[in-house]
């Protein structure tokens, strides 16, 4: 069976090797006689799955020992509440609003603390990023929140801001849901990172949280115990029953990522190199076209989520129908921005980009 290329923004395509391994182990994991779905989360079989997944993610992302890795639930939307419940101490937080997801974050945080919009790119209709030097950060803020890749608008911070040089003593919180494990992270600049797994790491159901140890233990009294980072960490992410199968698939994905190689580099360095090449190929094709265009500034274009528009919007439905006929799936853009969107996460092979570009050229020639 030849599988189509799936450009969904999330849940998204998974590495075929991971799906094949999961299928082979579905009824009997490593001779246990059980599917992972059937295991007790406190049994030795699942404990080994969990411990390996945690260790592999730490190694893969080069996470320092003073950070805890938590496997939580609720996705990025829940973290928009869980972060202020744990870090705000009921005081204040600064937000850099660069698109739909960071805007949702600041609105949710207002329920728990005083929120200041330190910077926004709304004036550019979320097609540029506000320069860090222009951010109005408060020295006494509990944390600074940045969504480092906006899935809908297709803008990405190519480098993490160093907010200490901007006069802030607050920890930086990053929502890296849609580009986690696509590039290295400078953990010296981060206090907490969170991301749903369903774009780059696995199926929906598990949320990865990486939190510096000194930031735990300060949850508001109203914070549910299951969302208290220290409680979750002290119980090895098993204070409540974790999403066991989602953790298992994420663990298989971590192993797949560790095996990836591009030239003389492996793991995340290889993925960064591969992702840069894939994105550049697609953006170049869009920029050379007379039919398609991308509105995002070249210096902040996302490597993961590539929105593009047709100059003749009346051809949108024909484009999507033709794409489906060419086994190119889920290219429709988000309803808030329209047009098309190709999400080209880690599992999207170069062949998928080439197939999409080939179809785009064919469609343009036909409708010139």
Curated annotation (Swiss-Prot):
Keywords: Amino-acid biosynthesis, Aminotransferase, Cytoplasm, Pyridoxal phosphate, Pyridoxine biosynthesis, Serine biosynthesis, Transferase. Its cofactor is pyridoxal 5'-phosphate. Pathway: Amino-acid biosynthesis; L-serine biosynthesis; L-serine from 3-phospho-D-glycerate: step 2/3; Cofactor biosynthesis; pyridoxine 5'-phosphate biosynthesis; pyridoxine 5'-phosphate from D-erythrose 4-phosphate: step 3/5. GO terms for cellular component: cytoplasm. The keyword Cytoplasm applies. Pyridoxal 5'-phosphate binds at residues 101, 151, 175, 198, 240-241. It catalyses: O-phospho-L-serine + 2-oxoglutarate = 3-phosphooxypyruvate + L-glutamate; 4-(phosphooxy)-L-threonine + 2-oxoglutarate = (R)-3-hydroxy-2-oxo-4-phosphooxybutanoate + L-glutamate. The keyword Transferase applies. One of its GO terms (biological process) is pyridoxine biosynthetic process. It is an enzyme of class 2 (transferase). L-glutamate binds at residue 42. InterPro entries: Aminotrans_V_dom, Aminotrans_V_PyrdxlP_BS, Pser_aminoTfrase, PyrdxlP-dep_Trfase, PyrdxlP-dep_Trfase_major, PyrdxlP-dep_Trfase_small. The modification N6-(pyridoxal phosphate)lysine is found at residue 199. Binds 1 pyridoxal phosphate per subunit. It is found in: Cytoplasm. Homodimer. Catalyzes the reversible conversion of 3-phosphohydroxypyruvate to phosphoserine and of 3-hydroxy-2-oxo-4-phosphonooxybutanoate to phosphohydroxythreonine. Belongs to the class-V pyridoxal-phosphate-dependent aminotransferase family. SerC subfamily. This is Phosphoserine aminotransferase. It comes from Polaromonas sp. (strain JS666 / ATCC BAA-500).
